[in-house]
């Protein structure tokens, strides 16, 4: 579990670094915090670069809507993952009046907890400010997974709704094809209208 957690933190830092290269601003404090956390969640290079990223990169090469939905899911997953990391940290107990060792041993966990809370806050802010629509859609998809498949009433109602759902899905598919054709025609028309310079 610790290895997958560390991989996730590495992927978060990689994603944030990639975003920075693309022009997004990552606060210096956030970069430093991630580096501090990577020191705590230290894994070998063999584990870090084993060719199996926590989050696949393929969805990021698709259409913008797909990328936005995927990144909304990634941010939601990071919220859950960082929450799990916080739960796994040992609870720090306040030191007794004569004890100094409790203070020294609790300091790294307190720092890690503070750093994780900061990163969690930043991820939540990004998700709520820029991925509201995707969050709603993802919640709807999660709700679909919670449908009780073995319930007779649910089965009957689902059959009743199938005609409408099937028609909607078919028309969406057709609309997408039509939009592609229109875009292709517009591009071809622009090519024809644009005079070639000799």
From Swiss-Prot:
Cellular component terms (Gene Ontology): extracellular space
Residue ranges, compositional bias (Basic residues): 178-198
InterPro entries reported for this sequence: 4_helix_cytokine-like_core, Interferon_gamma
Record keyword Glycoprotein present: yes
Signal sequence interval, chain numbering: 1-23
Region annotation Disordered: where it falls in the sequence: 173-198
Main location: secreted
Sites carrying sugar chains: 31, 42, 174
Locations listed in the record: Secreted
MF (Gene Ontology): cytokine activity; protein homodimerization activity; type II interferon receptor binding
Induction record: Strongly up-regulated in response to viral hemorrhagic septicaemia virus infection.
GO biological process assignments: immune response
Highest taxon in the source lineage: Eukaryota
Keyword terms of this UniProt record: Cytokine, Glycoprotein, Secreted, Signal
Secreted among keywords: yes
Assembly and interaction partners: Homodimer.
Role, per record: Cytokine which binds to interferon gamma receptor 1 (ifngr1). Also binds with lower affinity to interferon gamma receptor 1-like (ifngr1l). Has activating effects on macrophages and neutrophils.
Family: Belongs to the type II (or gamma) interferon family.
Protein name: Interferon gamma
Species of origin: Paralichthys olivaceus
